Structure formats: C-alpha cells, structure tokens
Amino acid sequence: MISMEQPPETELVSIEINDAICHLKLNREEKFNALNVQLITELCTLFDWTAERSVGRQGELHDSNGIPFLRIMVLSGAGRHFCAGADINMMRDAGANTAEENRIDSERLDRLFNGLWAHPCFTIGAVQGV
C-alpha cells in the first residue's frame, strides 16, 4: 500500500503536503536556486515519489484510510528568484569531465525534465524573479 507519510529526506528541496496539494520549494537561495547535481537529483526523487502518490497513478481520490492522493503539484523557489537555470560552476566543471560523466549528467537532466513533463499531477510554477 502507498503511504503519504515519510517523503524522502532532502536538503535542497522542501516538500509540504496539504490534502491533495504538494508544494515543492527549491531551497538554494544563495545561488538563486541554480540547478546543481544535488538539486537535480533531489527533484527527480521527489517527482518520482509524488507521482506514485498521485490520483493519476493510483486511479483513486483517496487511499483506504481516506487520505487524499495528490492532484496538484506547486513548484516554487525560495528567495527573490525561482531558478537561475544550471549552476555555472557545474557547467564549468563539465568541460573537464569525461564523455561518460557528461553522458550521465545528460541522462540526469533528461530524467528531471521528463519527470516534470510526464508528472500525473496538475503542475503549477510559482515563478518570481529569474
């Protein structure tokens, strides 16, 4: 049975669930929430976790205990800016990576974008700044 309790522990993304609404907040404010490997990985993990607990995947509005499955996901960023894009340091370091390391990075980004695109919840971007 799918449980709404115990979301994965993350450092750079906070998760708040209120009934059928899930709010994911990027928490890398000092870097304008720029995407680094850790932030991308945490977002992918949370996209997977929330998708499995969605009405779209479960085919039901509530679990057997009456707890609602997710229908809406709100994505926002802490501070003045939503997300500055890729972290410049990560991009700089990619120039020194091997082809295999860059392939793995590309697959990680593909998983991020496809996880968002294919997510079964209605997705709202609360965007401010850049």
Task: Kindly give the residue locations of the regions a language model identified.
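Glycine-rich beta-to-alpha active-site loop
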Residues: D110-V130
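Glycine- (often His-adjacent) and acidic-residue-rich active-site loop
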Residues: H62-F69, G77-G115
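Short beta-strand/turn micro-motifs composed of small residues
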Residues: S76-G77, V127
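Short strand->helix junction
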Residues: F32-N33, H81, V130
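Conserved CoA-thioester-binding segment of acyl-CoA-metabolizing enzymes
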Residues: M1-S76
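Histidine-centered beta-alpha loop that forms part of the nucleotide-sugar donor binding/catalytic region
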Residues: N27, A86, Q128-G129
